[in-house]
């Protein structure tokens, strides 16, 4: 069973056939890579995807609590609550979670990228990173707008403080830099402290 992605194009996911003592066994490619402790965070961050990633992390912890997990990120961002569920689980489990940006890590994707274990956060050379403040949209009674505005400001402050902790940047710098969309190359993400290094090939690891 493929538990790596939630995209409707799942039908196009290639299968891998392995020879075992009991005969042939087939896996979809994501389930096969899960055996190598590789998890993919692809597409918008939302509740269903977050639940699948949480389940995979907890499963891999039960398999071996002392071996690293590798989280490959290619995401435009998405739900803060779904992202924080992934973030909290990354910190809750015993294995280190190494994060690798392929393509893009924007918004909550960038936040999860920098939340990887120190020294184990990477970008591929042509990937892009984007940080900004959380977006809010609300429809309802006028009396509720103030409540939701306060909640958005509280979330913004929490995310900025955590980003400052993970990057080593001063809080006022993070607050200023996330006020608008802030795009970075892989090398700029290293300089900023979002990742630790750029992988050009496996030999550079």
Swiss-Prot record:
<feature type="active site" description="Nucleophile">
    <location>
        <position position="107"/>
    </location>
</feature>
<keyword id="KW-0720">Serine protease</keyword>
<protein>
    <recommendedName>
        <fullName>ATP-dependent Clp protease proteolytic subunit</fullName>
        <ecNumber>3.4.21.92</ecNumber>
    </recommendedName>
</protein>
<dbReference type="GO" id="GO:0005737">
    <property type="term" value="C:cytoplasm"/>
</dbReference>
<dbReference type="GO" id="GO:0004176">
    <property type="term" value="F:ATP-dependent peptidase activity"/>
</dbReference>
<feature type="active site">
    <location>
        <position position="132"/>
    </location>
</feature>
<dbReference type="GO" id="GO:0004252">
    <property type="term" value="F:serine-type endopeptidase activity"/>
</dbReference>
<dbReference type="Pfam" id="PF00574">
    <property type="entry name" value="CLP_protease"/>
</dbReference>
<dbReference type="GO" id="GO:0051117">
    <property type="term" value="F:ATPase binding"/>
</dbReference>
<dbReference type="GO" id="GO:0006515">
    <property type="term" value="P:protein quality control for misfolded or incompletely synthesized proteins"/>
</dbReference>
<dbReference type="InterPro" id="IPR023562">
    <property type="entry name" value="ClpP/TepA"/>
</dbReference>
<dbReference type="InterPro" id="IPR029045">
    <property type="entry name" value="ClpP/crotonase-like_dom_sf"/>
</dbReference>
<comment type="function">
    <text>Cleaves peptides in various proteins in a process that requires ATP hydrolysis. Has a chymotrypsin-like activity. Plays a major role in the degradation of misfolded proteins.</text>
</comment>
<keyword id="KW-0378">Hydrolase</keyword>
<dbReference type="InterPro" id="IPR001907">
    <property type="entry name" value="ClpP"/>
</dbReference>
<comment type="similarity">
    <text>Belongs to the peptidase S14 family.</text>
</comment>
<keyword id="KW-0963">Cytoplasm</keyword>
<dbReference type="GO" id="GO:0009368">
    <property type="term" value="C:endopeptidase Clp complex"/>
</dbReference>
<keyword id="KW-0645">Protease</keyword>
<dbReference type="InterPro" id="IPR018215">
    <property type="entry name" value="ClpP_Ser_AS"/>
</dbReference>
<dbReference type="InterPro" id="IPR033135">
    <property type="entry name" value="ClpP_His_AS"/>
</dbReference>
<comment type="subunit">
    <text>Fourteen ClpP subunits assemble into 2 heptameric rings which stack back to back to give a disk-like structure with a central cavity, resembling the structure of eukaryotic proteasomes.</text>
</comment>
């Amino acid at each position: 069973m493929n538990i790596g992605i939630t995209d409707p194009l799942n039908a196009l996911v290639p299968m891998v056939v392995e020879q075992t003592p009991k005969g042939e066994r087939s896996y979809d490619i994501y389930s096969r890579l899960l055996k190598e402790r590789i998890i993919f965070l692809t597409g918008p961050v939302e509740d269903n995807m977050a639940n699948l990633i949480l389940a995979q992390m907890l499963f891999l912890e039960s398999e071996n609590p002392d071996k690293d997990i590798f989280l490959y990120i290619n995401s435009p961002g998405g739900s803060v609550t779904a992202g924080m569920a992934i973030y909290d689980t990354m910190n809750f489990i015993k294995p280190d979670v190494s994060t690798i940006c392929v393509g893009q890590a924007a918004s909550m994707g960038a936040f999860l990228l920098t939340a990887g274990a120190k020294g184990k956060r990477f970008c591929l050379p042509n990937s892009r990173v984007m940080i900004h403040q959380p977006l809010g949209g609300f429809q309802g009674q006028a009396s509720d707008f103030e409540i939701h505005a306060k909640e958005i400001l509280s979330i913004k402050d929490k995310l900025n403080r955590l980003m400052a902790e993970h990057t080593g940047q001063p809080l006022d710098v993070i607050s200023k830099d996330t006020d608008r969309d802030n795009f970075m190359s892989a090398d700029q993400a290293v300089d900023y402290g979002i990742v630790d290094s750029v992988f050009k090939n496996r030999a550079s690891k």
